[in-house]
Amino acid sequence: MKKVVIFDTAIGTTNLGDEIILQCLEEQLAFLLDNCFLMRFSTHTKNMPLSRYFLETPKIQFSYEADFKLIMGTNLLSRNIRRTQSQWPVNRLDSWLYDNCIMAGVGTTLREGKITAYSR
């Protein structure tokens, strides 16, 4: 059974649009997800206390072993991630969680200007 991490954009937000997009994408990807073991992580809130990143917890282990990771729905991308911390609180300690993610239905708040090195 494949292990899949879903970064759930509907956890920790009152934006109904995030929930609608997520549900639609899950329906469209049911052929892929139905036979998988899923673990959900939030994109809008911290997933674990900082101390948990230094321990080998089941959640951390699952993330390392996941066959693939999906981020589905909402406007997460930005030229400057530090300015959108309430939308997607990524820091250096947990940024590895998002390595090699597949994004579907993810928009951007791109405006004029350069993409910061931190955002890359």
Which stretches of residues belong to each language-model region?
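Aromatic- and Gly/Pro-rich donor/ligand-binding loops
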Residues: 2-120
